[in-house]
Amino acid sequence: FHRDGSVREHLHRLAAEAVAAVADGAELLVLSDQAAGPDERVCDPHLAVAAVDKALREARRDDGSSRRRDVSLVLQAAGIRNVHDVMVALGFGAQALCPYAMMEKAMDGSPEPSTAADNVLSGLQKGMEKVLSTLGIHELRGYGRLVSAIGVTPE
């Protein structure tokens, strides 16, 4: 978002755009920071996905049901750097992730880039499985109810 705007304004605008896109029939939304220019600031990816998820849960169809079920959220962000970031993003509402900076870093200079990428994905998968099994959760959906923010206003 532009340097002159606030994080709050950006999140409200992003959420409104997402709700409008879903109302117009979008079934997949990709929240990405990859195209951010030099005059822009990058919003924390977890804040972005949480704001969009919340707005879609609150948005209603004509029959009164939530618009959140109409769309899948993909988070493409450089800020996804480890298993914790992955789990928080999934807990906040992302259905799929593209940790492009992590993948680029792993493959950069590697003699076998595809092996490096496979190793990153394998490590993330094992880490996710460990987190879920430690918490006694059998489905990824169950993780979301355990994620909360401390010290952040309800808004």
Where are these regions (language model features)?
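Structured alpha-helical segments in the cores of large, soluble enzyme domains
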Residues: 10-29, 48-60, 128
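Active-site mouth loops of central-metabolism enzymes
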Residues: 1-15, 72-81
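Conserved, mostly hydrophobic/aromatic
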Residues: 33, 89, 139
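Catalytic cores of alpha/beta
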Residues: 80-93
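Flexible, glycine-rich loop/tail regions that form catalytic "lids" or insertion modules at the edges
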Residues: 1-4, 17, 21, 25-26, ...
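Hydrophobic faces of well-ordered beta-strands that scaffold small-molecule active sites
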Residues: 29, 71-77, 90, 97-99
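Alpha-helix-loop-beta-strand connector modules within alpha/beta enzyme cores
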Residues: 41-73, 122-130
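Short, ordered loop/turn segments at secondary-structure junctions
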Residues: 34-36, 78, 94, 101-104
